[in-house]
């Protein structure tokens, strides 16, 4: 009896904190592509972004609480175990080594991240290990950078369900528009405002219990 290839997705990020935009986008792609598993992968030392505001342990705990019981979303902490920058290529190579040759691996990227790929570490090798699924928002600039046009001409597939083989192709998926960002959430929390309904209840409870993202107390009161 032939075993069907597994279909595994990866969504990386600082998740500082994880919010409904991350989660809704991940779930929509998982359902559309009928993924067996979609791994949210917190980065330890992102090469192209500022260092996270809270510890890796806190970010990991929030992501775990956010996806608990929500199949097929899972958490992969391998980048937090490395004592070096979190290069996506290293993570994909590590994941690919654990899969069967016919298994499909999908890297989820936002539009801005996709347009910035030419600045990534050994970015030309990414498609050797995975398909790339670009999460597209209706309000995003749809003009791709010059460096990506030849790649898109050769590798783009219009139907996300038509991706063939273990990797090597690029497709686009339209997201439900949710205007929420981790920066916005941190700013709201620092100003003492509520972020209810912007993050899952379990994440909000963790933030409250651990006092994360609050403005430092400067008046000397307890």
Swiss-Prot record:
EC number per UniProt: 2.7.7.18
Gene3D superfamilies assigned to the protein according to its UniProt record, in alphabetical order: HUPs
Catalytic reaction equation(s): nicotinate beta-D-ribonucleotide + ATP + H(+) = deamido-NAD(+) + diphosphate
GO annotation, biological process: NAD biosynthetic process
Function: Catalyzes the reversible adenylation of nicotinate mononucleotide (NaMN) to nicotinic acid adenine dinucleotide (NaAD).
Family statement drawn from the similarity comment of this UniProt entry: Belongs to the NadD family.
PANTHER family, A to Z: NICOTINATE-NUCLEOTIDE ADENYLYLTRANSFERASE-RELATED (PTHR39321), PHOSPHOPANTETHEINE ADENYLYLTRANSFERASE (PTHR39321:SF3)
UniProt-recorded name of the protein: Probable nicotinate-nucleotide adenylyltransferase
Originating gene: nadD
């Amino acid at each position: 009896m032939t075993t069907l290839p597994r279909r595994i997705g990866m969504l990386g990020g600082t998740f500082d904190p994880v919010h409904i935009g991350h989660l809704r986008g991940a779930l929509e792609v998982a359902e559309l592509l009928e993924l067996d598993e979609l791994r949210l992968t917190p980065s330890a030392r992102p090469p192209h972004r500022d260092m996270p505001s809270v510890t890796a342990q806190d970010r990991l705990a929030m992501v775990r609480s956010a996806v608990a019981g929500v199949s097929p979303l899972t958490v992969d902490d391998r980048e937090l175990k490395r004592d070096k920058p979190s290069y996506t290529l290293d993570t994909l190579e590590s994941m690919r080594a654990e899969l069967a040759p016919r298994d499909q691996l999908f890297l989820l990227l936002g539009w801005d991240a996709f347009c910035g790929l030419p600045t990534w570490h050994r970015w030309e090798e990414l498609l050797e290990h995975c398909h790339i699924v670009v999460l597209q928002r209706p309000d995003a600039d749809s003009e791709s950078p010059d460096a990506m046009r030849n790649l898109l001409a050769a590798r783009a597939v219009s139907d996300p369900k038509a991706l063939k083989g273990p990797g090597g192709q690029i497709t686009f998926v339209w997201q439900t528009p949710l205007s929420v960002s981790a920066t916005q959430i941190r700013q709201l929390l620092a100003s003492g405002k509520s972020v209810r309904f912007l993050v899952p209840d379990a994440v909000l409870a963790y933030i409250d219990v651990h006092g994360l993202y609050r403005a430092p107390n400067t008046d000397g009161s307890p």
